[in-house]
């Protein structure tokens, strides 16, 4: 995930996660994918009217789903046909890519995003599927890359970007997702 100073990665990553989920559930799962419950019983799932069902059953599914898609493992719980509870995407090697919570198919609470090697990339919260509150992004070194706040899914207030040495190099002020002002900082370059 990226901060609002880049203006695209938070919504882009959310879209990618949504597309991966929809692809797994709507397109791939009914055709070719096996989905497993905790007890390893295989079955196919389908989505009807926004609810998840076991193929051939009339009642919405409740249980745990583990699926694979494009070398990623997707795990989540389903209650009465809706994603509800822990949600994670991890690599085949076991490193998390994304982990968070879902209530009635909407992202809520704290979410963490990771680099492919398992190191933390960003952390923030969602309310009703929209980024909310303080979000922090990290370099692979673990140093803070940028931080800022969301209000109802839109960048709000002061956002700061740092270089890899920890020096502030950009400060942007947002109001309702729109840039109000921007200040760039530069340090003298020593040879």
Task: Please describe what each predicted stretch is.
Residues 2-115, 119-139, 143-151, 156-161, ...:
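Periodic aromatic/glycine/histidine/acidic cluster detector
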């Amino acid at each position: 995930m990226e901060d609002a100073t880049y203006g695209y990665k938070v919504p882009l990553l959310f879209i990618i996660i949504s597309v991966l989920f929809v692809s797994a559930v709507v397109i791939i799962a009914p055709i070719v994918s096996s989905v497993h419950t905790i007890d390893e019983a295989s079955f196919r799932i389908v989505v009807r009217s926004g609810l998840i069902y076991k193929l051939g059953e009339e009642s919405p599914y409740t249980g745990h789903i583990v699926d694979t898609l494009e070398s990623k493992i997707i795990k989540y719980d389903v209650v009465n046909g809706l994603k509800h509870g822990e949600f994670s995407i991890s690599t085949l090697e076991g490193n998390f890519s994304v982990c968070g919570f879902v209530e009635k198919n909407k992202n809520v609470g704290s979410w963490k995003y990771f680099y492919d090697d398992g190191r933390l990339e960003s952390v923030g919260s969602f309310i009703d599927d929209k980024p909310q509150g303080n979000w922090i992004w990290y370099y692979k070194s673990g140093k803070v890359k940028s931080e800022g706040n969301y209000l109802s899914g839109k960048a709000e207030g002061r956002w700061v970007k740092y270089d890899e040495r920890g020096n502030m190099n950009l400060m942007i002020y947002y109001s309702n997702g729109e840039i109000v002002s921007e200040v760039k900082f530069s340090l003298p370059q020593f040879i």
